């Protein structure tokens, strides 16, 4: 009996080994097929989640072929934190062809020589880039570096504000009209903060200098760009004082918690606030958004081509 069992086991083992070998061969052939695809036929996009019409992505390959006569396949990935995107490019040398960072990250990338100029030689295709709002272009150009204008390396895409999204059942518009709301004991464990180092810092430093802002002796822009040890220590102090009120640091789940009444307040971006208000309205929850009277950060996101991109041509057409 044991002899027969041994034969059966041996046959089963051989069959398993043969299956594994076959699977390895298939995987090998598959990877070979992928490796033979020319990189010039692939466009790697790295963008914020829910930040572009899916029809644009679906229609781009056909449009690109009409313009250039070349096939293109999109590889689309999303991120939710600027610094994660930057780390992948700066340290990991990821070969994304086009990404959409915020203005302050664009400035860092310019300083660190991590951007390529946008190729605006579109042949018979019209150049739409000059249609960008002059105001937004001007604001973005404030991040220019010596001998490098930001507008040669970035095209503005979206802009907005950072402010307070609040549940009107628990928070009044008057309460939400000042940054004091984030430090009010009433809101213990009821506040969601956007997982953004710059915006968290900005909120604390603006709150700390509310009197100076009211007297117009300092501007929000000056405060946001002050990274002195004294300013950092002051922001840290106020963020620690806010800690008991914080229910969590969110990148994308704020909308869900607000619509389910699990949080009353969400420090967030205006674009996310619009989505949250619409979703909450559908389930009978009334949310509103405001920028506190002390002032706030205005953000700009723009399309850029990272240094390690391998398809500058398609990236430039996509941006255009």
Where are each of the predicted segments found?
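Hinge/lid segment of periplasmic solute-binding proteins
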Residues: 86, 107-159, 173-180
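Short loop->beta-strand "edge-of-pocket" segments that line small-molecule binding or catalytic clefts
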Residues: 181-199
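Early extracytoplasmic/lumenal segment of secretory-pathway proteins
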Residues: 35-112
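Ligand-binding pocket segment of bilobal, Venus flytrap-like solute-binding proteins
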Residues: 192-193, 200, 204, 212-288
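Alpha-to-beta junction loops
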Residues: 91-100, 114-115, 187-189, 260-268
């Amino acid at each position: 009996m044991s002899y027969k069992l041994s034969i059966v086991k041996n046959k089963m083992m051989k069959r398993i080994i043969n299956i594994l070998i076959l699977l390895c061969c298939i995987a090998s052939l598959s990877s070979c097929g992928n490796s033979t695809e020319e990189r010039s036929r692939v466009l790697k996009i790295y963008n914020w989640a829910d930040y572009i019409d899916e029809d644009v992505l679906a229609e781009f390959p056909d449009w690109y072929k009409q313009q250039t006569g070349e096939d293109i396949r999109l590889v689309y990935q999303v991120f939710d934190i600027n610094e994660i995107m930057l780390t992948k490019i700066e340290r990991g040398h990821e070969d994304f062809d086009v990404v959409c960072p915020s203005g302050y990250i664009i400035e860092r990338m310019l300083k660190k020589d991590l951007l390529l100029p946008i190729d605006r030689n579109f042949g018979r295709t019209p150049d739409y880039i000059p249609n960008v709002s002059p105001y937004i272009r001007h604001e973005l150009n404030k991040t220019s570096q010596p001998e490098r204008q930001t507008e040669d390396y970035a095209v503005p895409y979206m802009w907005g504000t950072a402010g307070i999204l609040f549940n009107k059942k628990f928070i009044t518009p008057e309460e939400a009209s000042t940054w004091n709301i984030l430090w009010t004991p009433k809101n213990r464990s009821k506040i969601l903060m956007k997982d953004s180092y710059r915006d968290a810092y900005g909120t604390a430093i603006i709150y700390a200098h509310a009197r100076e802002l009211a007297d117009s002796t300092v501007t929000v822009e000056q405060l946001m760009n002050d990274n002195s040890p004294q300013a950092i220590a002051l922001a840290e102090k106020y963020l620690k004082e806010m800690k008991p009120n914080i229910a969590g640091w969110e990148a994308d789940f704020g909308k869900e918690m607000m619509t389910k009444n699990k949080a009353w307040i969400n420090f967030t971006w205006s674009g996310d606030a619009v989505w949250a208000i619409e979703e909450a309205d559908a389930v009978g929850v009334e949310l509103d958004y405001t920028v506190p009277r002390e002032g706030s950060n205005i953000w700009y996101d723009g399309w850029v081509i990272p240094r390690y991109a391998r398809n500058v041509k398609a990236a430039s057409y996509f941006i255009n």
